[in-house]
Structures are given as C-alpha cells and as structure tokens.
Amino acid sequence: MFGQYEVFVQLALLALIVLAGPAVILLLYLRGADM
C-alpha cells in the first residue's frame, strides 16, 4: 500500500536520476576538455 509520500519519493528519485545522468556526462566531458 503506497501513500503519497512513497510516490513522491519515487518520483523525486526518478527525476534525480534523469537529471543526474546528463549532468555527470557533461561534467566528465568538461573535465576531459580541460585536460
């Protein structure tokens, strides 16, 4: 039985993964470009 809190946490984690993916790739690209 899921409450609103659990659903919100799952959506927050999903959004974090979706946003963190490109952010990490961009960070690695910028670090690689500097070096």
Swiss-Prot record:
InterPro entries: PSII_Ycf12_core-subunit. GO terms for biological process: photosynthesis. GO terms for cellular component: photosystem II; plasma membrane-derived thylakoid membrane. PSII is composed of 1 copy each of membrane proteins PsbA, PsbB, PsbC, PsbD, PsbE, PsbF, PsbH, PsbI, PsbJ, PsbK, PsbL, PsbM, PsbT, PsbX, PsbY, PsbZ, Psb30/Ycf12, peripheral proteins PsbO, CyanoQ (PsbQ), PsbU, PsbV and a large number of cofactors. It forms dimeric complexes. Its main location: membrane. A core subunit of photosystem II (PSII), probably helps stabilize the reaction center. The chain crosses the membrane at residues 7-27. It is found in: Cellular thylakoid membrane. The gene is psb30. Belongs to the Psb30/Ycf12 family. Coiled coil: none annotated. Keywords: Membrane, Photosynthesis, Photosystem II, Thylakoid, Transmembrane, Transmembrane helix. This is Photosystem II reaction center protein Psb30. It is a single-pass membrane protein. It holds the Pfam family PSII_Ycf12.
